[in-house]
Amino acid sequence: QPQWKLFLKWGWLSFAVFVLMAPVFYTMYISFNELGFGAKYYIFTFQWYENVFSDKQLINALGWTMLLALITLPIVIPFGLLSAKLYKQSTQKVWIVFVLLSPLFVPADILGSALLVFFKNLNKFFTFISEHTGIYMFETWFDLGIMSAVIGLIVYTLPYVFVVIMITMARYRPEQPEAARDLGASAWRAFWEIEFPQIRAGVFSACAFVVILTFNEYTRTSLLKGGFDTFTSVLISQMLN
């Protein structure tokens, strides 16, 4: 490929990324302005960052949000990967896409409320079982808290993980791991050494998506989180007050 074509391609890609990221760069720029957003003059300061890192409530909420992301990641990524593999091998692709993407078409408040009612009724059921059997193992499993918030995040993020990995899987041919199996490789080795290197970018992109969506999520998590605050909920409450 001619050098000028390669230079033109990377130049265009860099320009597109710059245009997409320009609002983020501008926000970072004004975050160091002592006079705040929209001011006529610019005075450099770290004041706003000092305020953020000295806010114990905000830092605590940041920790809870990171915990939610770290718990959700190792659950939703394998589910998304297996769903994408099922889509790749199945002849009923339309139904798989319909089922996996259906949470995206349900408004956040309706989906969050439905999950809230579901967990409340499920908790009542296990409480009833506990009272009549004396087995209290599952009594508090579905109280509002970390577990309910994580389940809500899994329902919300799984469609995105599925789509990202599915698009990446379009690049490789399923005959390759099958050939490795025929040559004596185990299923895990065929996946890890042949399939995963080709879809690695999609898996890592899906991980980044999950973390970003966890920080961005407000409505569903607010209904399901129970007694702790997330980063977004604290930010919104501080802005409203």
Model-derived segments and their meaning:
Residues 11-21, 102, 155, 161-166, ...:
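Transmembrane alpha-helices
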